[in-house]
Amino acid sequence: MNRVLDLASSYAVSVARAGSGMAVGALGARPERPLELYEFEACPFCRKAREALSILDLDAVVYPCPKGGQRFRPQVEKRGGKAQFPWLVDPNAGVEMYESDDIVRHLFTRYGDGRVPWSLALAPLTLVSGAVASICRPLSGVRVRPSRAPERPLELWSFEASPYCRIVRDALCTLEIPYLLHNVAKGSPRRAAFVARAGKMQVPYLHDPNSGRSLFESADIVAYLDETYALEHGATARDVGADGGRRVSA
């Protein structure tokens, strides 16, 4: 996608969702272990779960499940009984669940003050604005691209409403690259620690523990992901095994 169009459509998503996930809300107890979220970027229901994580300043290991993906989708179907997204695993509460509304309620009850913000609580409005947001980027973060699986999950500092972070998440999603998501929305008490690590308050910020590389700038991050993990052009999803290796006929 053209860079200007990519940015414009990403901004449009943020506008459609009225900036939900841009700032931290009231925080409650903090989880001892990161949550796990199986989702794909373009899904409006998955977006609700990600917005809740951003508002509640929660980390999560994200397992991208784009259409046609074979790396993590089968795990969801095996554990939950169906390939439906989002799928949240909370090891701190011992729960696993589908349904974005149930996920949002669980997160705000356990990790917030129990009150779900209007941007996530008004079901008809949320459904319509979420659908409009997805229409703004109809081809982004939807279908799998053949890729090599990293040995260890990457790390991404981000917040849901940022149009630049969204572009990076699109790339991670279509390449089925798992990553530890560190949410640092406006008002996050963890921003100071992030600045101490990265040197400035700017997101997206990607760290790849497999190569030791750390990068700012969405365009540079996407180029790095393509260069490091995308397989050659022309490969199809069925050519690539669930572990990211190329299938070879016997």
Features from the language model and the residues they span:
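GST-like domain detector, emphasizing the conserved glutathione-binding G-site
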Residues: 1-161, 166-250
